[in-house]
């Protein structure tokens, strides 16, 4: 019996039903709930799994490099980045007939291939890779790293190599090493790579290990550094006529503050980026020496937190008790990390298109759309996860005695005020935004478009103007041509910024109007409602007015029937589950908005977005319906085309999404009855009844079925939009 799955739970291993399998999978990573877990073993397992995670990441990136080198067209693309379509990898499919082979043979390939919409070609090109040999070398190096990390993970589970629990709880040392080592040193190393390899390569100078020590990155070498004449490194930058990858129009500067974009590649200046990373390295290297470790110098984090008490004591005891609460709760730490990472991932989405860092990526429209959408969805999942682990912290790790009257306790004490404020904000945003949209729809339907309510986003336009956008005529700060900031901007700092912000062909501070105002508030509704559900789920995780004793029921309890006044949908897990639907909904609006605004910008018909985005029928007809025509046309009487695979994925995505409802809208009794019937029929059918199973089949629990439904809903939703996005964009722009 002991050898049955799951080994970590004897209780589950002895369960006679199929619950053993599903609960086993569900709790496999909930180390805290395992039979023989100790605090030390918990930390060791998590530590080892981090090495495994990194090994998988290195293996994955190695695979990208390897497949492009083997089956891609990187060298051909490097010769003509704007006209050669980058190949991700070859497709081998025995079902392909001649029409399919012809449809998918692209980019100068000998057979069917997938086009890369990930931006890796532009990335590798920008950082100085030029040949397939470079890609193979990178792939082998990352494969080697992957193996090293797998060995390291295994090694740190051995008795001699296991760190102690006190090592894991040494917050000051960890923070110092992460700030100086992870951010500081790696940023410095990246500056070095940009200065020694990428910038010379962009100027036609090929630097590799054989000539690395002979080619000076700057004509004067290190002399300006040691003599304090650092401004020499910024003199003679690349000219506006510079051809990327050649010496034509190239300068000698390595650390600049030009601002704006390289005219040919439409990406940030490499020398600006090197300068940026050097500054980051400097700041973080200093930051990593702030906290007290071996030598008794520097700050104690506990002292800092204990000192954070509001003046007069009227707002409680501030941060007292927080240090030990956070340092002893892995869920709290994970919640903080996920919240930070989620926000950063969303910022990456916003900045990758508005300030493109990679050469020629701004002209690869499908890649721009794919990367924006990808990073926003990832951000959504990570951010909801932050609240999930915040709720688990409150259930498992929060000790009221340790946190009397501090910020945590006060959050819990006035949770009703927080929740009700989020509620009225959501209601206000929702009803007003929908009201405006519906009013405009009715006006269009009755043929009086001039009676629409169209509100100019004057505050947002003012902010854009303050940053230098002159279109709106606000004449303020950087857009005021007579002001000192404007004059300084032309020479002292970022002279290219003002040109970039007033160039209507890029995505930097796009021109905005009433359609943007409305969709902004629709997105604000989605964000506030998602936040409301997540915050309420976390703050009510230990107990609520209806059910004061939730703590003992744990994180994911299901309905407890009508006897307790009905406890459906009030566990912290239920709140997370509901919030994910709202998160997907919100990111749907975000990506619809971004994509529609950009395809009209790229096609040169911004009037379509401006005129049609002010009413709901405009969104349905001129964005969704109009752009799905390529997908619906994937198969037609003339055979197939290169969009057929996306047409199929569009259909398949809808199927997966719709399957989710089968789990979401039917309850346990239905499934249990169906299973009993099928099992009965199976046992009485000749031949079929030769196959028996050990576990009695039972229906999934309510919580499990909701998870399965949510997973199908999410995956189907994203699959469907991915197919729509890639097909509609690549169908227009190739």
From Swiss-Prot:
GO molecular function per UniProt: 4 iron, 4 sulfur cluster binding; chlorophyll binding; electron transfer activity; magnesium ion binding; oxidoreductase activity
Positions of phylloquinone binding: 671
Root EC class: oxidoreductase
Gene3D superfamilies assigned to the protein according to its UniProt record, in alphabetical order: Photosystem I PsaA/PsaB
InterPro entries found in the cross-reference section: PSI_PsaA/B (IPR001280), PSI_PsaA/B_CS (IPR020586), PSI_PsaA/B_sf (IPR036408), PSI_PsaB (IPR006244)
Entry binding sites for chlorophyll a B3: 662, 670
A GO BP annotation: photosynthesis
Transmembrane segments: 46-69, 135-158, 175-199, 273-291, 330-353, 369-395, 417-439, 517-535, 575-596, 643-665, 707-727
Binding residue positions for [4Fe-4S] cluster: 559, 568
GO annotations of cellular component type: chloroplast thylakoid membrane; photosystem I
Keyword list, A-Z: 4Fe-4S, Chlorophyll, Chloroplast, Chromophore, Electron transport, Iron, Iron-sulfur, Magnesium, Membrane, Metal-binding, Oxidoreductase, Photosynthesis, Photosystem I, Plastid, Thylakoid, Transmembrane, Transmembrane helix, Transport
Keyword Transmembrane helix: yes
Record function comment: PsaA and PsaB bind P700, the primary electron donor of photosystem I (PSI), as well as the electron acceptors A0, A1 and FX. PSI is a plastocyanin-ferredoxin oxidoreductase, converting photonic excitation into a charge separation, which transfers an electron from the donor P700 chlorophyll pair to the spectroscopically characterized acceptors A0, A1, FX, FA and FB in turn. Oxidized P700 is reduced on the lumenal side of the thylakoid membrane by plastocyanin.
Protein name: Photosystem I P700 chlorophyll a apoprotein A2
Source species: Pinus koraiensis (Korean pine)
Primary gene name: psaB
């Amino acid at each position: 019996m002991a050898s049955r799955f799951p080994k970590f739970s004897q209780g589950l291993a002895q369960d006679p039903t199929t619950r053993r399998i599903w609960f086993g999978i569900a709790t496999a990573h909930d180390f805290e709930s395992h039979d023989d877990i100790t605090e030390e073993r918990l930390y060791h397992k998590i530590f080892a799994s981090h090495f495994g995670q990194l090994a998988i990441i290195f293996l994955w990136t190695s695979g990208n490099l390897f497949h492009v080198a083997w089956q891609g067209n990187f060298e051909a693309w490097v010769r003509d980045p704007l006209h050669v379509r980058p190949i991700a990898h070859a497709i081998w499919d025995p079902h392909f007939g001649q029409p399919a082979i012809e449809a998918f043979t692209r980019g100068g390939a000998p057979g069917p291939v997938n086009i890369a919409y990930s931006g890796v070609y532009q990335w590798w090109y920008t950082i100085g890779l030029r040949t397939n040999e470079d890609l193979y070398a990178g792939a082998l190096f990352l494969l080697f790293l992957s193996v090293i990390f797998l060995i390291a993970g295994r090694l740190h589970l051995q008795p001699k190599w296991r760190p102690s629990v006190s090592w894991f709880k040494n917050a000051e040392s960890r923070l110092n090493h992460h700030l100086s080592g992870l951010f500081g040193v790696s940023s410095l190393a990246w500056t070095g790579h940009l200065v020694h390899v990428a910038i010379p390569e962009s100027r036609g100078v090929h630097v590799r290990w054989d000539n690395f020590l002979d080619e000076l990155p700057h004509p004067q070498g290190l002399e300006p550094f040691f003599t304090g004449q650092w401004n020499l490194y910024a003199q003679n930058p690349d000219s506006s006529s510079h051809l990327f990858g050649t010496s034509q129009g190239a300068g000698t500067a390595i650390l600049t503050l030009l601002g704006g974009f390289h005219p040919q590649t439409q990406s940030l200046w490499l020398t600006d980026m090197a300068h940026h990373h050097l500054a980051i390295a400097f700041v973080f290297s200093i930051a990593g020496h702030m906290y007290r470790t071996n030598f008794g110098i520097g700050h104690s984090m506990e002292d800092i937190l204990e000192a954070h008490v509001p003046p007069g004591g009227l707002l409680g005891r501030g941060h007292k008790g927080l240090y030990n609460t956070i340092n002893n709760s892995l869920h709290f730490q994970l919640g903080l990390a996920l919240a930070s990472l989620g926000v950063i991932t969303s910022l990456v989405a916003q900045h990758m298109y508005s300030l493109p860092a990679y050469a020629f990526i701004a002209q690869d429209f499908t890649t721009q759309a794919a990367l924006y959408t990808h990073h926003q969805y990832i951000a959504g999942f990570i951010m909801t996860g932050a609240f999930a682990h915040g709720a688990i912290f409150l259930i498992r790790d929060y000790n009221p005695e340790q946190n009397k009257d501090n910020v945590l306790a006060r959050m819990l004490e006035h949770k009703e005020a927080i929740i009700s404020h989020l509620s009225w904000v959501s209601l206000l945003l929702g009803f007003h935004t929908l009201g405006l949209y519906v009013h405009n729809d009715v006006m269009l339907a009755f043929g009086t478009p001039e009676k629409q309510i169209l509100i100019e986003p004057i505050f947002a336009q003012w902010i854009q103007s303050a940053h230098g956008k002159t279109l709106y005529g606000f004449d303020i700060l950087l857009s005021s041509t007579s002001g000192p900031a404007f004059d300084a901007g032309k020479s002292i700092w970022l002279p290219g910024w003002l040109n970039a912000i007033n160039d209507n062909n890029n995505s930097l501070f796009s021109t905005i109007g009433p359609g943007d105002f409305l969709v902004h508030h629709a997105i604000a509704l989605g964000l506030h409602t998602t936040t409301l559900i997540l915050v309420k789920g976390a703050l009510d995780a230990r107990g609520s007015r209806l059910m004061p004793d939730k703590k003992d029921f744990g994180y994911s309890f299901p309905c407890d029937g009508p006897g307790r006044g009905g406890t459906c949908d009030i566990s912290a897990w239920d709140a997370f589950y509901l919030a994910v639907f709202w998160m997907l909904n919100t990111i749907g609006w975000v990506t619809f908005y971004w994509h529609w605004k950009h395809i009209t910008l790229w096609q040169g018909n911004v009037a379509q977005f401006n005129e049609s985005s002010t009413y709901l029928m405009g969104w349905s007809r001129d964005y969704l319906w109009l752009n799905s025509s390529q997908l619906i046309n994937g198969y037609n009487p003339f055979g197939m085309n290169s969009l057929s695979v996306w047409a199929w994925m569009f259909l398949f995505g809808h199927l997966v999404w719709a399957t989710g409802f089968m789990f979401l809208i039917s309850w346990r009794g239905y499934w249990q009855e169906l299973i009993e019937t099928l099992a009965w029929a199976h046992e009485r059918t000749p031949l079929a009844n030769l196959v028996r199973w050990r576990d009695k089949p039972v229906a999934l629990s309510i919580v499990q079925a909701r998870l399965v439904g949510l997973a199908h809903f999410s995956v189907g939703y994203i699959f469907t939009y991915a197919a729509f996005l890639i097909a509609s964009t690549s169908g227009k722009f190739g």
